[in-house]
Amino acid sequence: MSKIIAVNAGSSTLKFKLYEMPEENVLAEGVIERIALPASHVEIKYGDGKKYEKTTDVKNHEQAIQILLDQLLDLDIIKEYSEINGVGHRVVAGGEYFDKSVVITPDVLKKIESLTELAPLHEPANVLGIKAFKKVLPDIISVAVFDTAFHATLPEKNFLYSLPYEYYEKYSARKYGFHGIGNRYVSQRAAELLGKPAEDLKMIITHLGAGASICPVKNGKSFDTSMGFTPVTGITMATRSGDVDPSLLAYVMEKEGMTDINEMIKVLNTKSGLLGISGVSADMREVEAAQATNPRAKVAREIYVNRIIRYVGAYLAEMGGADAIVFTAGVGENSITIRKEVAEGLNYFGIGVDNEKNDVRGVVRDISAKDSKIKTLLVPTDEELMIVRDVQTLANK
């Protein structure tokens, strides 16, 4: 029996989930927010619905980890630090270096640091978390689990852009994809639900959260993904644009007097998507609530659904059909109407949902209509569980 902690470090946040393995029992989970900012907030959920909260000052990630571990002791979740046998770090970009999870060595850490250009908003924070945990718990196994690794199986025809080939040779300019940790978990859980090995199935995973992507999985391996070199491409998201004609960006920059491309990249990442079109919110629930009286909210939602249908339809053609369409992540797990409308838009392919079965949120369920040729599944994602499983596998080698 061992205790393994899964960590997702952001620039000012530290999310964690502590598991007892191999039973996969969650002992505690929580977040430390506003690190290096005034009035940092600590929240830990544990036991049978218990919650600890505190507002304090947290100067950096190292102090955040120290506070977290001390609080786990105070709450009697652990008796001593040595009970924690391993830590798994979610790392956004693995580039072409990493096609699977790895034990973090000095050389591995250097390579991760060299990949910050691929995920400038996330990778530096991931590195901070790794270094901070190494300082506080230097003797335990530390594992990097990459969001891009699942997509290392993409064929060239799906990861190369139609740009001069030398850009790929010189700069590794290609599609990397994201949401890979969640995609891997969901594909395995969906296979269990269908009662078949993942290697014998074709499925399309629709990860619909604040960030959103579509991933066709063929014989247990990622075959393509709607996200690209960065997470901004693909379908419409909460604040990200999804696919846009690059020439339009140059046109708008000239009209708006923008001289720095990073200004436009910020617009694409933080001011577009549902928020940009609706002018109401990045939250689908608020957009849905406003659509009856707000035409922009209505069309934002229509664009969102239409882009999903477009990508799923293309991937169905590309893979020669599928055994299942799988909904996951915040919107996918909780929006009954989005699931219904996407299925209706794909009815031509023999996809449909049963209204009664679909009337649920956040559970594992087959929600297919009786006469469906392709199953429709609801599978909540669990990235943290995937991370700690990888840590345990590597620790046992």
Swiss-Prot record:
Cofactor binding, note field: Mg(2+). Can also accept Mn(2+).
EC supergroup of this enzyme: transferase
MF annotations from Gene Ontology: acetate kinase activity; ATP binding; magnesium ion binding
One of the protein's GO biological processes: acetate metabolic process
Coiled coil, from the record: none
Tree of life domain: Bacteria
The keyword Kinase appears for this protein: yes
Entry keyword annotation includes NAD: no
Any one cellular-component term (Gene Ontology): cytoplasm
EC number: 2.7.2.1
Family under the similarity heading: Belongs to the acetokinase family.
Protein name: Acetate kinase
Source organism of the structure: Fructilactobacillus sanfranciscensis
Gene of this entry: ackA
